[in-house]
Amino acid sequence: MAKITKEAALLYHSQGKPGKIEVVPTKPYSTQTDLSLAYSPGVAEPCLEIEKNPQDAYKYTAKGNLVAVISNGTAVLGLGDIGALSGKPVMEGKGLLFKIYAGIDVFDIEVDEKDPEKFIAAVKAIAPTFGGINLEDIKAPECFEIERRLKEELDIPVMHDDQHGTAIISSAGLVNALQVAGKKIEDVKIVVNGAGASAVSCTKLYVSLGARLENIVMLDSKGVISKTRTDLNEQKRYFATDRTDIHTLEEAIQGADVFLGLSKGNVLSQDMVRSMAPMPIVFALANPTPEISYEDAMSARPDVLMATGRSDYPNQINNVIGFPYIFRGALDTQAKAINEEMKIAAVHAIANLAKQPVPDVVNTAYHVNNLSFGPEYFIPKPVDPRLITEVSCAVAKAAMESGVARTEIKDWDAYCVHLRELMGYESKLTRQLYDTARRNPQRVVFAEGIHPNMLKAAVEAKAEGICHPILLGNDEAIGKLAEELDLSLEGIEIVNLRHPDESERRERYSRILAEKRAREGFTYEEANDKMFERNYFGMMMVETGDADAFITGLYTRYSNTIKVAKEVIGIQPGFNHFGTMHILNSKKGTYFLADTLINRHPDTETLIDIAKLADKTVRFFNHTPVISMLSYSNFGADTSGSPVKVHGAVNYMQKEYPELAIDGEMQVNFAMNRELRDAKYPFTRLKGKDVNTLIFPNLSSANAGYKLLQAMDPDTEFIGPIQMGLNKPIHFTDFESSVRDIVNITAVAVIDAIVVKKKNESR
């Protein structure tokens, strides 16, 4: 992790609009009517409804998705008691995390009050505004009483994240580390160094999970907390040990199975780690300097199972894995509280997630090939997109089962879809593709079975149930790669096209291809040679019905692949060209871009084919095409160069297909801005319509356009390139394609294959 300088931190917070969060309107406000509805007089109606039924605040206001992050600044991170206002950047940061990880809106509230009673009164007074309250950076022991009282006296979820966030994540880590070590929680000896809010809450949750009080030793700055001491508060007395033979950490740690550190750096020595039981679990969570460094712990004994609070080492105990999703589940059930059942549900959901196959987006983020459950990975990574569904659902179910939910979630699949859409992890179009493919999975050939991304994509597509994968490549090489990536090849067919066992099939394919291209100078001998190439062999599998779709491109230049596709598969009747399309899923909507791959310098005839194919393809995806044919000029303003080709294509399409919403040539800003276009060019056939399909004048502009959009907003989902115009489902990837890109194209290929089969059956 790069070193953060003071100058960089201050610049980050001050540049542009100061701070890190803002309020954004969620309703229209551009007209006087909008404003009259938003405020007076229209706003009176929801006010009266809420007066009659306070629960309607969840229906008519933002309360149900609004959390207060409240602090008095008495224990700010590692800075201590710096005051309420000084802690505001931290509270804004917490609000940012709520928003980006769970879509929850936040008001940060800094209360300049250290007296617990007055602080409680202030929070209670503003509580009606919020659906939940996250207490933050309040010092112990006052934080215990403040949280207890607010939980008792308010009917919305209240959680002090410094206590329970760390407790939940470390508990999930402990559950999994114990599984790796082959130990049971009720049997292990636990040493806790630190007795602040986090340490106390962690240890209490361990007890809820089955740890025995008599097996726990807790230490504070004065040493072991024993029943012989007279200086203990209520929280410390709960964990006081009967043992009188130990007084220091060095004495307490001997033979221990688990060390939990929430204290200060460098207090646990290598000798202490060596004195622990076999496969010791060390959670050194002091930040930024752990109780023992990862390097020192691992060099002391290689069997240690270690977690820290740092992102640059394995198994980070990071509260962001928990609090956004715990509040998400609580808010979505309008829960009255966050109780022990909900916290334990979160623990098990987080723990179970670490045991599941890791999405490629996570591997990519951490620059590894394949994370898998074990000593270096027993806690999920914060970027794991499954946390929003796994943890939120578990918490919501626990809220309902434990009786604190005011509303029920009845369709859990729909709820998960809602959560993924909320975070932009899934668009409606993508979900429809996958759902359709699952209902009728087809045989899909993956050309480059030895490429890690294609192998992962085939395995993921199989797991998603969208296809029956066939991998082309050497069995042993693919098996070895799968073993390295910890992937199961169960249910996946491997075809070694160069193996002698495939000689009969190569000969059969050669005869068919030679006969098909006989009048084009293509001999049987040439065809036989080509069958040792993956693209020829794979496409012939589709051509002969041995497979239903083919995906290629990670190792092959497009120009070569296009040539093979034309020779083996051919172009659909009625067309002289084929092309490709990219689909862009953005917050503004779904857009279709063509031709993004095939035709470098299309003439008018080619542009006509691209437009006709785009029309068919957009309808294939259940959208009504509104097509803009792009150029650098508008509607005949330039009568030379490329605009003339586009203008000619538009004239043809409007004449031959008068029902089609298509116009041009036009600049992209006029295509994308309906009001601007209608005002300047009221005669256009697209008047009053929002364009969703963009036809580019050449490959340079198309390629630059979609890649510019990708670079400017990496969160925008692109699906493609989607082939348009070949006789059968041959689809392309490129060397930049991620696993998710390939799986998305696989879903498209499957649906393409289904449509082709239906057409053939109807003939």
Task: Give the positions of each predicted feature.
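N-terminal ligand-binding/catalytic initiation module
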Residues: 1-158, 353, 397-398, 431-455, ...
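Adenosine-phosphate binding glycine-rich loop
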Residues: 2-3, 161-162, 181-183, 284-392, ...
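Glycine-rich adenosine-cofactor-binding loop
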Residues: 66-78, 83, 167-170, 181-207
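Anion-binding alpha/beta catalytic cores of soluble intermediary-metabolism enzymes, centered on
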Residues: 85, 137-184, 406-409, 415-763
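A short, aliphatic-rich alpha-helical micro-motif
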Residues: 127, 185, 252-253, 273-276, ...
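NAD(P)-binding Rossmann-fold cofactor-contacting core
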Residues: 193, 209-236
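Rossmann-like adenosine-cofactor binding region
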Residues: 237-305, 310-312
